[in-house]
């Protein structure tokens, strides 16, 4: 199957990259090593994945210190995902719940204890650094978004235990939270040095923009990563749930997913012109925030197209070819 479908992942706005990209990427690996997050199997892979470069594209206007926090947070998410896979926690609901509850306690200000894992100590360091730059209400919102991310992880685990594949509507509703995108959007305010008032952040148009941006990011990711999910027998992917629900071929499922993605891009562009006027200061902040959403959309695509994390292996390519020919 050719890769021409990737050319349909287009946006009517451009991304950017921080001048601190390379040094932040190197520092993130050093941070991960310091906290013992780099297992032997992850050490070589992490050098190639360049999580710091994803942060540098997602928050290109952040100062050096804030960009480092963002890069370390993004790396922490990936390391947690990888270590849950390696240790089997990703398929053990009770162990997952216990781990998540401990992480949430850390985000609420708890101190790591001797029995805690390396991820817990690393998260405590992130929380400490965030607390130096963010107000309490921001920390509470961030923690809530992480909690919703964990809840979506548990939902996926239950599905795997039952051998269940969700329908498209249910999957899309959960996908809004399973990628931790809202928690990453929270960092836009810190990166742009803005603070949106409650009434602006919770305005329906702003929330619709956030949801559209979230969908665009997650669905783009799904289109690019479906070979990896196929290889691992994981049906939590937009392409694969479309294929299952509609009993269609893999190329048709990809085409349908790309159509959904394109419609969501159109929704984002349309809603962007509908942002209401509050006052000069608030709308200046909103303009920076919406631009931050656009940076994240482009960052996700550009990094995913070059990162080895979603590059299909020889085995997954063979599986895709076999399914496509059925």
Swiss-Prot record:
Pathway: Secondary metabolite biosynthesis; terpenoid biosynthesis. A motif (DDXXD motif) lies at residues 81-85. The keyword Lyase applies. InterPro entries: Isoprenoid_synthase_dom_sf, Terpene_cyclase-like_2. GO terms for molecular function: metal ion binding; terpene synthase activity. The keyword Magnesium applies. The Asp-Asp-Xaa-Xaa-Asp (DDXXD) motif is important for the catalytic activity, presumably through binding to Mg(2+). This is (+)-T-muurolol synthase ((2E,6E)-farnesyl diphosphate cyclizing).
């Amino acid at each position: 199957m050719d890769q021409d479908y990737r050319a349909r992942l287009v946006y009517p706005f451009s991304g950017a990259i921080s001048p601190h990209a390379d040094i932040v990427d190197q520092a993130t690996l050093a941070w991960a090593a310091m906290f013992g997050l780099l297992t032997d199997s992850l050490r070589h892979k992490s050098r190639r994945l360049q999580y710091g470069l994803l942060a540098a594209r997602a928050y290109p206007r952040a100062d050096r210190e804030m960009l480092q926090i963002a890069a370390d947070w993004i790396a922490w998410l990936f390391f947690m995902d990888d270590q849950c896979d390696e240790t089997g926690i990703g398929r053990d609901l009770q162990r997952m719940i216990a781990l998540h509850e401990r992480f949430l306690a850390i985000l609420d200000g708890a101190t790591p204890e001797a029995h805690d894992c390396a991820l817990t100590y690393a998260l405590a360091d992130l929380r400490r650094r965030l607390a130096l730059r963010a107000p309490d209400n921001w920390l509470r919102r961030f923690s809530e978004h992480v909690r919703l991310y964990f809840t979506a992880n548990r939902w996926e685990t239950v599905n795997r235990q039952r051998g269940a594949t969700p329908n498209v509507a249910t999957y899309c509703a959960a996908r809004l939270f399973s990628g931790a995108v809202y928690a990453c959007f929270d960092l836009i305010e810190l990166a742009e040095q803005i603070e949106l008032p409650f009434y602006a952040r919770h305005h329906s148009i702003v929330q619709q923009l956030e949801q559209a941006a979230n969908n665009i990011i997650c669905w783009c990711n799904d289109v690019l990563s479906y070979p990896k999910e196929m290889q691992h027998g994981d049906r939590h992917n937009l392409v694969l749930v479309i294929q299952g629900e509609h009993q269609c071929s893999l190329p048709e499922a990809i085409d349908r997913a790309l159509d959904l993605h394109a419609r969501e891009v159109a929704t984002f562009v349309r809603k962007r012109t509908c942002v209401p006027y509050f006052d000069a200061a608030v709308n200046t902040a909103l303009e920076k925030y919406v631009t931050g959403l656009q940076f994240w959309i482009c960052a996700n695509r550009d990094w995913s197209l070059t990162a080895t994390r979603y590059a299909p292996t020889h085995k997954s390519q063979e599986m895709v070819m076999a399914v496509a020919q059925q």
